[in-house]
């Protein structure tokens, strides 16, 4: 078995029009790509010598053209198994807040995007490991929980 700890996952949120809630970004994988046609969060691998924070910010720019206004480190690490390569993957997770009017610029890995209202996010995430992070994001970051200042990454 292979074990990798060089992945990042980024939940991207933006305030909705009323500024009373948030919506989350999902990108649809291009049909010709791995997991083609599925809706995904921003994910990727760290490059040699790159920190997890730098990788999260780079993957955001590369996959969506977005820049984080705020970035939060989530406590849990997402862990999943890729059976085709017999690989256990540990992915460091972040939540990025972007400006409401931010424009999406997709890279060739993706062919569409959508913003999912906060209350619908759990039902739209394909992986259980992602769904387990939603309560922490909502409680600690979006609802200004007591951990929020400690999770904020200095950019």
Describe the residue ranges of each PLM region:
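Conserved N-terminal beta-strand and adjoining loop/helix that marks the start
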Residues: 1-25
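Short connector loops at helix/strand junctions that flank enzyme active sites
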Residues: 5-7, 36, 41, 72, ...
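Short, well-ordered beta-strand micro-motif
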Residues: 12-14, 93-97, 115-117
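Short helix-loop capping/hinge motifs at secondary-structure junctions, enriched
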Residues: 17-19, 101-104
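Flexible, glycine-rich phosphate/dinucleotide-binding loops
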Residues: 19, 33-34, 80, 122
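Conserved Nudix-box catalytic region and its N-terminal flanking loop in Nudix hydrolases
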Residues: 20-62
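Nudix hydrolase/Nudix homology domain
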Residues: 34-38, 103-155
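Active-site segment of metal-dependent pyrophosphate-handling enzymes
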Residues: 65-102
């Amino acid at each position: 078995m292979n074990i990798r700890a060089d992945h990042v996952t980024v939940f991207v949120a933006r305030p909705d029009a009323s500024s009373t809630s948030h919506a989350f970004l999902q990108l649809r994988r291009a049909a010709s790509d791995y997991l083609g046609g599925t809706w995904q969060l921003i994910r990727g691998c760290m490059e040699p010598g790159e920190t997890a924070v730098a990788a999260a910010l780079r993957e955001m720019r590369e996959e969506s053209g977005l820049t984080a206004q705020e970035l939060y480190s989530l406590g849990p690490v997402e862990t999943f198994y890729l059976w085709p390569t017999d690989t256990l993957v540990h992915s460091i997770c972040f939540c990025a807040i972007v400006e409401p009017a931010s424009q999406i610029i997709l890279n060739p890995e993706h062919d569409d995007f959508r913003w999912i209202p906060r209350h619908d996010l759990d039902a739209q995430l394909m992986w259980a490991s992602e769904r387990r992070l939603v309560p922490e994001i909502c409680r600690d970051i979006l609802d200004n929980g007591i951990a929020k200042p400690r999770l904020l990454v200095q950019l």
